[in-house]
Amino acid sequence: MGCYNTKKTGLGSMKKCLFLLSFLCVLPLCLLNAWWRRFPAQTAVNPSSFRNITILLWHWPNGKSSSLKRDTCWDLYRISRCRLVDQRSLFPSADVVVFHNRELALGHQKLPLDLPRPQGQRWAWMSLEAPIHNGKLHQYANIFNMTISYRRDADVTIPYGQLLPKEAEGHLVDNVPLNKSSLACWVVSNYRKHHKRSKVYQELKAVVPVKVYGRWTETPLSQNALLPTISRCFFYLAFENSISKDYITEKLWRNAYQGGAVPVVLGPPLGDYKSVAPPNSFIHVDEFASVKDLGEYLQQLAEDKKRYSDYFTWKHQWTVKLYKDWRERLCKICSHYNSLPQEKVYSNLEAWVKG
């Protein structure tokens, strides 16, 4: 019986037919909706992620420039859509303008405050120095939108070094240097009696022998001799010249880790080191009640081959990565650009730097 055969159907049959037609129309929509809901919701995409980000370096750190030919960030570091330039004529089109603080602090460079600043352009303050060496920063209130620093809480973190996972684990016999002839050594050029590291050294050398190299003792080491010399020491004094948050320099990454000596560290708190270095890969001065206790521990450890070798276990899984090229640090900005707040401004840069 068809729905439109009105001769043989009454009002009740007509209602049934209309209900059936409605059901048949709605059913496909329900099935389509159920199928569509299997897929995750699409998030909004930042349009800037589809275009090149231009990073303008206003002046090269320490006056030492590097080549920016072709697509530097992609060719050297496989960072895409990142254009690194140093021509000031490109200021109007730059997404980020980077200023290295040392040249500003010394008065060798100035901020281009006289130029009309394009809408949306971000200015980045960059420094690898400890706060005490950054000079006065109060005049930079409400100017910078971004910080580039070794600090882990910076907008773009550029450490002196870090540990990266190895593709394949190594063998312990290959990881522990065997040519040890000195208990402890220290390479220092800038020696100041009032520095904490100088006071610790004076106390430590009364307990254990410490060989000292560097301009301070008029026994400087060439770059070629540095690591081979350190490799002959059981321990290396990786003492920072400033006790500041996250300030961990090449003294740990290059001198100690790459040199093949167990680092005895003095710098930021123990927690800062634990955040970036494997456990049982370093010895922190603050872990001991006195420098005398530290010295006695070093003597005992050097005599215990098994316990000493445990401090090199990290080399099974990790390898040291040093950051020495400013281009690599600058290209890293593009990896963070789209995730940073667009309207961020440092109202008190000095407070952040000293924080």
Regions found by a protein language model. Give the residues of each.
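Pol beta-like nucleotidyltransferase catalytic core
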Residues: 2-125, 135-253, 257-355
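A short, histidine- and acid-enriched strand-loop-helix "catalytic/donor-clamping" loop
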Residues: 129-132
